[in-house]
Amino acid sequence: MKLKWPNDLLLGGTKFGGMLSVADQKQSFIVVGIGINIGWAPEAAAKLADLSDDPSLTPPVFLGELLRQISDLEKLSNERLHELYVADLATLTRIVQIEFTDKQVVVGRAVGVNPDGRLLVQTEQKLLTIETGDVVHLRDAGGE
């Protein structure tokens, strides 16, 4: 399993889930949603059942394990969480295309993630700090 910046979950390079969060303007609260394909997936998507033939992998079992892991993550420092996130990030080193809501498109190499979670993309002209946008993986450092 790998992550695609900022919030997609990948199995073998194919999306099987994602996270979405929305805050009010004052940022006094955040609503977080998680969608994960467990036993079924739309066409061209992956599902967790692809990893195992274990019939005990049901939504309630998965939810219990997810909550346990979230509890473990809550005990970690921000620095350690950042390290773990970056270690599992499939986006790094790849040539990416960032599509912004204003229809602007930028192409460059994903070179890092800053401590605030923003993607660092090196274009031919400069290093950009990306806060939001749709990311398309074009190829990795080896040209794939």
Roles of regions detected by a PLM:
Residues L11-E144:
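Long, positively charged amphipathic alpha-helical accessory segments at protein N-termini or as interdomain linkers
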Residues L3-N7, G12:
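Alpha/beta catalytic cores of group-transfer enzymes, especially the acyltransferase/condensing modules
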Residues M1-K2, I30:
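Short, surface-exposed helix-loop/turn micro-motifs enriched in polar/charged residues
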